[in-house]
Amino acid sequence: MVKIRLSRFGSTHNPHYRIVVTDSRRPRDGGYIENLGHYDPRKTTENYLKINAERAAYWLSVGAQPTQTARRLLKAQGVKVA
């Protein structure tokens, strides 16, 4: 199953996340199909959340399932999530 989920990067005590499309059987930080954007939970910059809404809508239309956190972030960016 194809999922839209967060993949962690950054350093110790300074997490950043990529919002990626990946196969659900892959490891959290393993390879992914497409990178949709990024999220900084510490909100250290003005653009702490950036998502390519057009590509996210495409992946949702072909059946990708977002995780609960990814769904919340997609909604925050105005992407229609069923």
Swiss-Prot record:
Keywords: Ribonucleoprotein, Ribosomal protein. The keyword Secreted does not apply. GO terms for molecular function: structural constituent of ribosome. One of its GO terms (cellular component) is small ribosomal subunit. Pfam families: Ribosomal_S16. One of its GO terms (biological process) is translation. Belongs to the bacterial ribosomal protein bS16 family. This is Small ribosomal subunit protein bS16. The gene is rpsP.
